[in-house]
């Protein structure tokens, strides 16, 4: 998979990608804190990711509940933060459906999921992962039998977890992913089997101020 930024000679300068460095698995699990409570929260987060990769919703929700109880009862600094198992599982499934093939890169998987996260944060789209994915006319994969029975791979669960923990590769205004251009492209990926996938910017750049 090759990354090929697209430039239009007459277009206004595009925003630069955010410099969100990939976190280590320890940081993802504990928030960087070293304590009994952080270790326990990390244990339950690991249980959540394992459940997602096995398609075990009941176990995942149970692990989330236990992890939240640990976080609520502790004062670990920094706060490892709560993560919804349903968000993790649903995001993982969409990433797996769109980019689950084993020859695709982790970066591509992150970008696929990042479009969803950008939409959640955008004033142009619904404000939850569920509502973004199930918005009419958007992610049609959710209405298929394949999606209903899909169990995400560990790689896709890992990509979803990193996104939920704040990792980013693009800019907040990248809200389109398609095999056809849907606005000004921020970047694109070319694969001999899948063809070209474009990640495009919203037409309403004024809604996405750059810090």
Language model: regions and residue ranges:
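Bacterial extracytoplasmic/cell-wall-associated proteins, especially those involved in peptidoglycan
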Residues: 65-211
């Amino acid at each position: 998979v090759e990354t090929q930024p697209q430039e239009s000679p007459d277009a206004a300068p595009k925003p630069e990608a955010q410099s969100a460095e990939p976190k280590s698995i320890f940081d993802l699990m504990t928030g960087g804190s070293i304590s009994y409570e952080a270790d326990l929260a990390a244990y339950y987060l690991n249980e959540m990711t394992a459940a997602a990769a096995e398609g075990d919703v009941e176990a995942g929700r149970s692990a989330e509940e236990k992890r939240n109880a640990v976080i609520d009862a502790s004062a670990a600094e920094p706060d490892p933060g709560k993560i919804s198992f349903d968000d993790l599982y649903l995001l993982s499934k969409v990433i797996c459906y769109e980019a689950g093939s084993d020859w695709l890169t982790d970066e591509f998987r992150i970008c696929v999921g990042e479009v969803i996260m950008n939409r959640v944060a955008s004033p142009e789209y619904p404000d939850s992962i569920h509502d973004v994915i199930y918005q009419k006319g958007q992610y049609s994969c959710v209405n298929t039998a394949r999606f209903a029975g899909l169990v995400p791979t560990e790689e896709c669960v890992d990509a979803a977890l990193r996104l939920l923990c704040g990792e980013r590769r693009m800019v907040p205004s990248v809200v389109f992913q398609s095999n056809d251009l849907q606005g000004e492209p921020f970047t694109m990926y070319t694969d001999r089997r899948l063809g070209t996938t474009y990640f495009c910017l919203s037409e309403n750049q004024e809604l996405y101020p750059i810090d």
